[in-house]
């Protein structure tokens, strides 16, 4: 017997309880192209390697970052800089895979995006919002062996609704009738799918995964949380207090706002993409143009999270496929450099107001505390409060720590219990 639309909706909602408040969320600021980390986070004023970049004091004693990032600087008591990151890949595609998964490339196993891993870790507490959402494009790294259930929902432009999240106008569109007809079709599809799985003995394979993805999509169609993708009001229905400050950052700033709203509404991970950082020439003119938007987006995000009491529940990290060369090339740009670069991390269990790692006087070499990609990701997972020995099984059935066998979280950056 077919379910009514109301009972089918109830069945879907029963499968997707509201996210528990104890879960922390992750916001990944993804700078596509290989961002010039030295020009963001280094402080070696006067060194020829700094070019035209000048570092300025921040709200955190002893921490200096680019003078074009004053809003981020005002929030540095809540953020930390890792200045001695060493990754392994200087090719865009390979570097993106390493830095979005936290693991070396393995030709036998397609590793999942960090957002997919976070979604998987919180799988018992899924809500009706997608657990992993990517705003403004993506880096091309998918859910890997975890499957599409843990893939990112793409949002091409902040403020736009997800594609196909409203019933087609041919069956009534965004009306009660449209929702009822959509759910009846969903009920029919589910029964056909269940029959197919039973007849082929495929309950545990791709057919079941396909059914899960379809059910998640339908749950979004009927979700009251769907309005959270709009930027005309806040999660609580009130005007957005810092809207104008975010808007200075254009689409990137609005993407940071959307990430805050989505994580507050229950998303496990939101990736905000900001591309075009492959600056082999004329880098300093480009930085003067682009850094104000970056500052508005990230600086306002950190301020907003702190003011709303959400920073302890939200980890923010800046990632890219690699950094850029310390020395400026003859064209006035910087080339690919995975060997020494920096990231910012804030929120969750992170102790802000500090720099980890020491570079030489001209920033060309590491003097203290090198950090591997695995160490960085182990620190991210620890900042989220993941169990220290949390493991995941790959497509070959092999268990391994989320950040790899040799990875160790950076104790200095983490709050003690």
Question: What annotation goes with each model-predicted range?
Answer:
Residues 1-417:
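Ligand-binding pockets and gating/stacking loops
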């Amino acid at each position: 017997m077919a379910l009514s639309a109301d009972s089918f909706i109830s069945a879907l909602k029963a499968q997707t309880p509201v996210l528990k408040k104890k879960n922390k969320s992750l916001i990944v600021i993804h700078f596509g192209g290989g961002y010039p980390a030295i020009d963001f986070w280094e402080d070696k004023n006067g060194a020829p390697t700094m070019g035209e970049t000048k570092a300025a004091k921040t709200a955190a004693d002893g921490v200096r970052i680019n003078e074009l990032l004053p809003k981020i600087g005002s929030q540095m008591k809540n953020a930390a800089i890792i200045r001695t990151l060493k990754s392994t890949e200087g090719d865009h595609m390979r570097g993106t895979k390493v830095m979005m998964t936290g693991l070396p490339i393995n030709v036998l196993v397609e590793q999942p995006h960090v957002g997919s891993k976070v979604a998987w870790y919180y799988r018992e507490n899924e809500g009706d919002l997608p657990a992993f959402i990517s705003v403004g494009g993506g880096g091309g790294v998918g859910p890997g062996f975890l499957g599409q259930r843990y893939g990112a929902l793409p949002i091409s432009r902040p403020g736009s609704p997800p594609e196909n999240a409203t019933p087609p106008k041919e069956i009534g569109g965004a009306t009660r009738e449209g929702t009822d007809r959509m759910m009846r079709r969903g009920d029919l599809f589910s029964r056909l799918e269940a029959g197919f799985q039973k007849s082929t003995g495929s309950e545990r394979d791709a057919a079941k995964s396909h059914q899960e993805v379809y059910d998640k999509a339908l749950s979004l169609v009927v979700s009251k949380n769907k309005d959270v993708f709009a930027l005309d009001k806040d999660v609580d229905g009130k005007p957005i207090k810092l809207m104008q400050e975010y808007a200075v950052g254009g689409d990137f700033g609005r993407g940071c706002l959307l990430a805050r709203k989505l994580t507050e509404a229950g998303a496990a991970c939101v990736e905000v993409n900001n591309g075009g950082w492959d600056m082999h020439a004329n880098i300093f003119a480009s930085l003067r143009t682009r850094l104000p938007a970056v500052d508005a987006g990230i600086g306002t995000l950190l301020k907003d999270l702190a003011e709303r009491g959400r920073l302890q529940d939200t980890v923010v990290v800046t990632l890219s496929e690699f950094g850029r060369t310390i020395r400026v090339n003859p064209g006035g740009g910087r080339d690919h450099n995975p060997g020494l670069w920096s990231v910012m991390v804030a929120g969750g269990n992170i102790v802000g107001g500090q720099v980890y790692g020491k570079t030489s006087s001209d920033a060309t070499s590491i003097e203290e505390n090198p950090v591997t990609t695995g160490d960085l990701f182990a620190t991210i997972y620890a900042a989220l409060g993941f169990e220290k020995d949390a493991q995941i099984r790959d497509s070959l059935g092999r268990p391994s720590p989320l950040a790899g066998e040799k990875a160790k979280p950076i104790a200095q950056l983490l709050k003690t219990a």
